[in-house]
Amino acid sequence: MKQLLSLLIALTFSSISYAQDNRVPSKGLALFSKDGNFEPYEFSRHAIGDNDILIDILYSGICHSDIHAGRSEWGNTSYPFVGGHEIAGRVAQTGKNVTKFKVGDYAGIGCIINSCGQCDNCKQGLEQFCEKGMVGTYGSHDHFHDNEITQGGYANNYVVSENHAIKIPQNADMKRVAPLLCAG
């Protein structure tokens, strides 16, 4: 746990510039095997789309689901694995069609980061049953972005559709908000 906290603190103070039209560089903590320890990991997230927001992560909770997935106890974990689906942070950039957020707003992310938004289930707010397949925060094939494997919130940033982010009041204590996002 001390190792994880030390690495998270180091990531918080590292500087990354954001690409406008390209993939977003990210730094996180990853497991490279089910028996490994967290290690620093540099990767990239998909480019910020017209309906996406880029969140600078302030806090990410640790859920037992992260432990199960990281140890591949549910099977088929892809490594390197960056866990974390209880994400609270500040909006750093918005796509041109974003209406729910502005730069500087607090935002949260739960366990689902994308769905088609068009099928009957999505229209009823049941994105977890998206007929085209929902995209999870980590370890999920993102079929909306070249089928890349999603990486979670044990990182410095996250790109997410505005429809799958939650606006957090500016007076919220963000370290207490992150664990509330466990259920998405």
Identify the role of each PLM range.
Residues 1-4:
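Positively charged n-region of N-terminal signal peptides that target proteins for export
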Residues 30-37:
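Extracellular beta-rich ligand/substrate-recognition surface
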Residues 46-60, 73-123, 128, 151, ...:
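Glycine-rich beta-strand-centered segment in the early N-terminal region that forms part
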